[in-house]
Design a protein with these regions (language model features):
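C-terminal regulatory/interaction module of P-loop NTP-utilizing enzymes
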Residues: 1-316
Length: 316
């Protein structure tokens, strides 16, 4: 640090601290800490606290002594809440979105080659420890942890248990005294495509919450309904959400409508009303924001029939 500012090392640096080495170590990439600063966290808009989840997750993040898992459907604000808390409290955020192809190298790191030879590019786990030590307090946010294969999940065991460390590229990464790293993960319900159960040993490391889908009353709080007709648009839309959820419970459809879908609906409805669009605004909004989500032909026809009946429209 110089004059309170981060002085970046060269793009590649030599590992020192030989006592922490656990294997061969050489050049590694440097970390641009400003990327993870709370000042650079995206503003995802105001978060609506429905069930006291803001206070609970804030407490978990401030204590940073237990990994926390949020289990819930897509589009209900899991990511938004983590961003909101970190921005508000000046906490650095290291966010990582898991996918079907995420592997050990994404978590721990991988060897790369440049004109000077090989070097180790650190993955998200060692990066999180470095950011926490630099900023004194950071959150490692692992989005969609259930997308990880079981053999990849095991590499999270060590950072999430009482060892609070990881080994990568021949070096041990751990927290300095007085530094905190809160770990928050999210996952969608197991019935979603591409979602795996967490292994027992990984589950045993988490505490957490299971978030339910918002009720119609809560959806009225989340969505900005100003200038949206109640009888012809708002009420039928809320009814449709409940109907499609019932269809999902019977396994007739895979996709359920989330708050994100409703927000898209009212935004598109407004946009079309303010544009030069000459067709039926309600029917077009339904097609663009609801029916487009159902790619299976049988599900598409079923949901279209429900939309026609609920909204009193005639979408062909």
């Amino acid at each position: 640090m110089e004059n309170g500012k981060v002085k970046y090392l060269d793009t590649l640096i030599e590992q020192d601290d030989r006592e922490n080495h656990v294997g061969c170590a050489g050049r590694v990439n440097s970390v641009e800490y400003d990327i993870y600063s709370s000042k650079n966290i995206e503003d995802m808009g105001e978060y609506k606290d429905l069930n006291g989840e803001v206070a609970r997750l804030t407490d978990v993040i401030m204590k940073a002594d237990k990994p926390f898992l949020i289990y819930g459907a897509k589009g209900i604000g899991k990511t938004s809440l983590v961003h909101h808390i970190c921005r508000k409290n000046g906490i650095s955020l290291v966010a990582f979105s898991c996918g079907i192809g995420t592997n050990k190298a994404d978590l721990k790191g991988r060897l790369q080659v440049d004109k000077d030879g090989s070097y180790f590019e650190r993955g998200i786990l060692p990066t999180a420890f470095l950011v926490a030590n630099e900023s004194k307090h950071a959150v490692l946010y692992i989005d969609e942890i259930g997308a990880l294969d079981h053999d990849v999940q095991k590499w999270l065991n060590r950072p999430l248990d009482d060892r609070h460390s990881c080994e990568a590229g021949g070096r041990k990464y751990t927290l300095n005294e007085g530094c905190k790293l809160a770990i928050v993960a999210t996952t969608n319900p197991i019935e979603y495509a591409g979602v795996n159960n967490l292994t027992e040993d990984l589950r045993s490391r988490f505490i957490g919450q299971r978030w339910k889908n918002p009720t119609s009353t809560q959806l009225e709080e989340i969505v900005d309904w100003s200038d949206i007709p109640d009888a012809s648009v708002k009420s039928p839309l809320l009814t449709l959400v409940e109907d499609i959820y019932a269809l999902r419970q019977k396994a007739d459809v895979e996709y359920i409508l989330s708050p994100r879908d409703l927000i898209q609906f009212v935004q598109v409805y407004r946009d079309l009303g303010e544009s030069s669009f000459s067709g039926d605004i309600l029917e077009e909004t339904i097609s663009e924001t609801i029916l487009i989500k159902y790619t299976d032909p049988q599900e598409h026809e079923l949901v279209k029939a429900r939309c026609n009946e609920t909204f009193g429209v005639s979408i062909a």
